[in-house]
A protein has these predicted regions:
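Glycine-rich catalytic cores of cysteine/serine-nucleophile enzymes that process amide/ester linkages
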Residues: 25-104
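Activation targets extended, charge/polar-rich intrinsically disordered C-terminal tails
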Residues: 127-324, 328-329, 335-342, 348-391
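A general structural signal for short secondary-structure junctions and capping/turn motifs
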Residues: 2-3, 22, 40-41, 52, ...
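Extracellular structured ligand-interaction cores
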Residues: 46, 59, 108-110, 146, ...
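A cross-kingdom signal targeting lumenal/periplasmic-facing segments of multi-pass membrane
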Residues: 68-159
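Internal catalytic domains of large membrane-associated glycosyltransferases
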Residues: 6-9, 22-24, 31, 133-135
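Alpha-helical membrane-anchoring segments
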Residues: 22-24, 40-42, 248, 303
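Bacterial Sec-dependent N-terminal signal peptides
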Residues: 1-22, 387-391
Length: 391
């Protein structure tokens, strides 16, 4: 859904075409849904609006998923949540060309709008195309290429639009929604679960689910619109514009985070019992605590120094707490630091016991990583009852 045009972006874009509202009776609007790819930015798919005006021979696609990769301080702005996306207009052929090249399907659904609604939609798009309006601050859950289309349709159709009644069954969370697209990519899911906070565990009602392109298509397919005294489907006339199946990604359990971290626990425990050199053990612990310290710094950054709402209130900061960094300093200085290791040990044990009652869903790999912290901190706690304590 994040349309990062890594090839020269502006070679495929045309000028910002206005939508003519003078021929609204002949104008047809389509929802374009693009399939997921295998790159990180493309696994969620993409959405765009297509407007066709037959008498003017105009066939344009309006795409809210573009940003300029050459933006100054791009990486920093992206991490801080201050990267602006923009609306661009392009020809249908240039839009489809990207998906043909990437072997990703593109589905089209006609949006059932009357002449007044098409005119209103055209006015809204033209207003959005103005230079002062075409950029917007991207928000993964609440303001992206899909929610922009949803909002325009709602404004154009008004009260004649009817979403299905709230379902009685279990509502998915935002984390659940994105996780289904991450299943073929366990390391990506690990990373996303790591940086997304408890706000991602909010229940996603019907309208909220439209932040994902394929879900936008699915939810609008269940949506009705009032026409001539009866309710009819909002989307109709499904068509395949680019015919590729969903990508097949081979998974290997032996490279997945749970297997890798389980193996790491075993190797660390074996090393701790077999290696007699305290210097070697200290170097191993420095390496381990360095990794956890970096992750702890990331948790602090995403909790307190980013505008990404999805990363706020991230309870992973419990097991990736700043005390880990103090342990690293003690190891580097070759000091005992018993108090710091005891704090990390207690917090790690508490997290493993209480994680299931916390208001955040934790990846199983986090428990395995916490066990590594628990084991290595227990070794340096200097508890008399602990047989692993360094002598």
């Amino acid at each position: 859904m994040r349309r990062i045009f890594l090839i020269n972006l502006f070679l495929i874009l045309i000028s910002f075409n206005k939508v003519s509202s003078q021929s609204a009776g002949d104008t047809v609007a389509y929802l374009l849904t693009c399939g997921p790819g295998t790159e990180t930015y493309s696994i969620y798919g993409h959405s765009a609006l297509r407007i066709v005006i037959p008498e003017k021979h105009q066939d344009s696609v309006y795409n809210w998923g573009v940003f300029d990769f050459n933006t100054p301080n791009f990486v920093w702005k992206f991490a801080k949540g201050r990267l602006d996306y923009m609306l661009v207009a392009q020809s249908l052929n240039s839009f489809l060309g990207v998906y043909i090249y990437e072997h990703r399907y593109v589905y089209s659904h006609k949006i059932n709008l009357d002449a007044n609604e098409v005119r209103k939609l055209a006015e809204l798009i033209n207003e959005n195309l103005k230079p002062e309006n075409r950029k917007y601050r991207y928000d993964f859950f609440y303001d992206d290429c899909s929610t922009r289309i949803r909002d325009l349709i709602e404004k154009a159709v008004g009260e004649k639009l009817k979403y299905p009644q709230p379902e009685a069954g279990k509502m998915p969370t935002f984390r659940d929604m994105v996780a289904k697209y991450q299943e073929p990519f366990p390391w990506l899911r690990f990373g996303v679960d790591l940086i997304m906070g408890s706000t991602a565990d909010k229940k996603a009602v019907f309208r909220d689910r439209m932040f994902l392109p394929i879900d936008l298509k699915n939810e609008l397919s269940e949506t009705l619109v009032y026409r001539s005294g009866k309710m009819i489907p909002l989307l109709q006339n499904p068509e395949v514009l680019v015919d590729f199946g969903s990508p097949v990604v081979k998974q290997n359990f032996f490279t997945s985070p749970p297997f890798v971290f389980t193996l790491a626990i075993i190797l660390i425990m074996i090393a701790g019992s077999l290696i007699k050199s305290s210097k070697t053990i200290r170097l191993i612990d420095i390496a381990i605590y360095s990794v956890f310290s970096i992750l702890s710094i990331l948790m602090i950054f995403f909790n307190f120094f980013t505008d990404h709402l999805q990363m706020k209130w991230n309870l992973n900061i419990i097991w990736l707490n700043p005390f880990i960094f103090m342990c690293l300093i003690m190891l580097i200085l070759n000091k005992s630091g018993t108090i710091w290791f005891r704090i990390v040990f207690i917090i790690s044990a508490a997290f493993l016991l209480l994680q299931y009652v916390l208001p955040q869903d934790f990846n199983i790999a986090f428990s395995l990583l916490t066990i590594i912290l628990l084991v290595r901190s227990s070794v340096r706690c200097e508890y008399d009852w602990n047989p692993l304590t360094l002598k």
